[in-house]
From Swiss-Prot:
Part of the 30S ribosomal subunit. Contacts proteins S3 and S10. Coiled coil: none annotated. This is Small ribosomal subunit protein uS14. One of its GO terms (biological process) is translation. Keywords: Ribonucleoprotein, Ribosomal protein, RNA-binding, rRNA-binding. Gene3D superfamilies: 1.10.287.1480. Disulfide bonds: none annotated. Belongs to the universal ribosomal protein uS14 family. HAMAP family: Ribosomal_uS14_1. The lineage of its organism: Bacteria, Pseudomonadati, Pseudomonadota, Gammaproteobacteria, Vibrionales.
Length: 101
């Protein structure tokens, strides 16, 4: 189990990403606009750098919904490989079964 503080930190990051998503996207469009002046683009870069570090989507870490485990995360299920295996063995995931050949 992940520490509660780690889960809380990830939740805080998710809120920040959602809060600043539009502003961050607008600044990135302005930065990549070749028709904008160099000064406008540079101002946009400075404004982007001034945003909170945790508002970047790449700072988020996928974690298991049940345990908070950061490694072995399977996006399709939102769980770690261990919890997917446990659920599979109990028959809780429809259509998923142990491989046999």
């Amino acid at each position: 189990m992940a520490k509660q503080s780690m889960k809380a930190r990830e939740a805080k990051r998710a809120k920040l990403v959602a809060k600043f998503a539009e502003k961050r996207a607008a600044l990135k469009v302005l930065i990549s606009d070749v028709n904008a002046s160099e000064e406008e683009r540079w101002d946009a870069v400075l404004k982007l750098q001034a945003l909170p570090r945790d508002s970047s989507a790449s700072r988020q870490r996928n974690r298991c919904n049940q345990t908070g485990r950061p490694h072995g995360y399977l996006r399709k299920f939102g769980l770690s490989r261990i919890k997917v295996r446990e659920a599979c063995m109990k028959g809780e995931i429809p259509g998923l079964r142990k491989a046999s050949w």
